[in-house]
Every structure is written in C-alpha cells, then in structure tokens.
C-alpha cells in the first residue's frame, strides 16, 4: 500500500475495462498516457460515472469529408461505451486561426464565415455521432468573457520557449518566417477549453498533439485531474499520398451523392483500401484480417472494395442507395450512361470544346478541360475527343469527362 498522501486509489482493471481500452485503441496513432486512461475507465466503471470526451473542430469550411470522420468514428465508439461526448465548435478559436502544420500565418475567418460554416457542421457530424448522446458547446461561451485581463493571466501560464518546442513554430522561427503573437494564443485557448469542460480525454489528429498537451498542462495548473490525449492518424486522400483535403481535390464529402461517393471509393488503390478499412470501416479487425488473407490467397480485391464502398455509402445515405450506386457503377464500367445525368442547354454553336465543358459544369476551367482532353478523358456520344481546338456544332449529345461526370447537352446557335 502506498504511503504517499496524494496517491489516488487504484480501481480494478476488469474484463469490461480491458474491452473498452481495446476499442479505444483501435486505429489510433497514440494514446497518452495509456495507464492513466485505463484507470479513468476503471473508475468510470466502478462509480458508474461516464468520462467526458472532448473533440474540438473549428468550422473553417462548410463541409465535412471522410478524413474528418476518422476522429468522429472514434467519438461514436466511445459514445457507444457509455461516455459523454462533447462536440466543441471552435467559434472563438476560428477567429485566431489554428497554426498547426502551417509554414505561414493562417488567415483568420470573419465571424460571418464562422457562423455560416458552423450551421452545417453538427448536422453533418450527426450522421456519425449519436445526436441524443452528444453535448454541443461553443468555446466563445467561456473565451469571450475572459476579456483582456483574463487573457493576459492565461498567457502568463505558458512561456515562449515552450511554444517554440512545437515543430512548425521552430521551423518558421529558424527559417525567419514571421510568427504572429496571436498564433501563440491558439494552443492556449484550445487548452483552456479542456479546463472549462473538465475533459477526461481529448481527441485530435496527429498534427494536434502539441495543443492537446497544452490542455493537459493547463488542467494541472488549474488543479484539475489531467486529461489523457488520443491522436488519430490523418487519412490519406484518394491519391494515397497527401492527407485528404478539399483544397487538394482528393476528398470524399459525406454529403456527396451516393453514386459519386461510391465511384470515388472504387477508384482508390488496393493498398489504400486496407488503410480505409482500418480507419473508416466498422467491421471487426478479425473480419478485415480475414478479407486481407482471402485477397492474398487470390480473391479479387475488387470484391472487398465494393464491400467498403457500400458500407460507407449506406452509413451516410441508405442501404438502398448503396445498392443503386453499385448498379450505377457496374453500368458505367460497361460503358453505359447513368439515368440521372443533368440536362444542360447552351447557346453559341459552333462552340469551342473547352468552353462547352466549362459551361456544362463538367470542369471548373477551360485549362482543366484541355488537360482532360490530353489525357483522353473526354467523350461525346461515346467517341473520345482528341482535338483541343474542336468546335462543336449545334445538336443534342451526351458529354462525358472522366469516369463519373456526365451531361446531356442541347447546343443551339
């Protein structure tokens, strides 16, 4: 028995606790500190008091993609274990701009942009989380009332030297790239959120580790039990190289049409498919391992890619939508034209092919249109277009760009 008067009683690590710990650790990058978190789980089980699990997201864009759902899936698993999930919308911290992973100052958003983005954020997140078991908070609740006096007192709790331990700040400092003072406030304000919420566990991407540790340190200074931190891997985009990002065009939005979502998922490499299974699928690890063994034994990996795509489409739409998306995909793979393509009427024949593709909404720019023609990705009524200077005469025809973009065009003089 410990003679340390500050030591905490140890709670028994039961099979229930071991199961909860295994669920928590699935697919994570790092859990700090695992022994502490096991004790938090054990205490929760013994006292029947749920843990407070925090996830903060700044509404920097209106749409959520599959990359965001990696951490949301983990939150849902923790909800299903009976814990309280706090979905924190960073309406105050968005005004500062998160510098994590940046090599230059991130421009802060306006309050109007933040409010507009925040409207759709939780509605999309609720496609993953259990709405009835989710506590929604805004960090302006406690950050705005701090005022200048409170902000200065908070800033006194951390040093510039500690801030410069963060890799992205260090690189910018050593490279002579400016770091604005307000950027140092971001980790502090995120950390103060944990104090305000008395969080037991905070989740984030691997690029958030420093900020999460600041929260742990501030809780100690405020006399609270320190939160554990759990970092989730950053999901690679469809290219399998860079992290999924709307700005890079390698993303799958959770509000996309079922056919588009299905087609994008079927386009990933066989190697990336297993990564998506691990981070996005709700199937057991044993089942995924069995699938992998069957693929290595000669079964077509496409079979498993279809399972993955259908599971994800069904989650965000419905099982019926997933079945229809598979039918549509197979139809297109055989050279067929989908039934639900948009009809577009254009004028100005004869019209340059680049302009036609742009005006039909099939490409964002004429330069993108010409790139697709160079790559053999443009078809009119099934015939590949190779002439970038083509002028298209008046008529009605089906135009295709890539595997998934179609339009039924009526072109007049």
From Swiss-Prot:
GO biological process, one term: tyrosyl-tRNA aminoacylation
Cellular component terms per the entry's GO annotation: cytosol
Record-listed ATP binding positions: 246
Localization, UniProt: Cytoplasm
Domain S4 RNA-binding, chain residue ranges per copy: 351-411
Listed SMART domains: S4 (SM00363)
Enzyme Commission code: 6.1.1.1
A GO molecular-function descriptor: RNA binding
Motif ('KMSKS' region): 243-247
Keywords noted in UniProt: Aminoacyl-tRNA synthetase, ATP-binding, Cytoplasm, Ligase, Nucleotide-binding, Protein biosynthesis, RNA-binding
The reaction(s) this protein catalyses: tRNA(Tyr) + L-tyrosine + ATP = L-tyrosyl-tRNA(Tyr) + AMP + diphosphate + H(+)
InterPro entries to which the protein is assigned, alphabetical: aa-tRNA-synth_I_CS, aa-tRNA-synth_Ic, Rossmann-like_a/b/a_fold, S4_RNA-bd, S4_RNA-bd_sf, Tyr-tRNA-ligase, Tyr-tRNA-ligase_bac-type, Tyr-tRNA-ligase_bac_2
UniProt-listed Pfam families: S4, tRNA-synt_1b
Intervals of motif 'HIGH' region: 59-68
Protein family according to the UniProt entry: Belongs to the class-I aminoacyl-tRNA synthetase family. TyrS type 2 subfamily.
Function (record text): Catalyzes the attachment of tyrosine to tRNA(Tyr) in a two-step reaction: tyrosine is first activated by ATP to form Tyr-AMP and then transferred to the acceptor end of tRNA(Tyr).
PANTHER family for the chain: TYROSINE--TRNA LIGASE, TYROSYL-TRNA SYNTHETASE
Assembly and oligomerization: Homodimer.
NCBIfam families per the UniProt record, alphabetical: tyrS
Identification of the protein by name: Tyrosine--tRNA ligase
Organism: Burkholderia pseudomallei (strain 1710b)
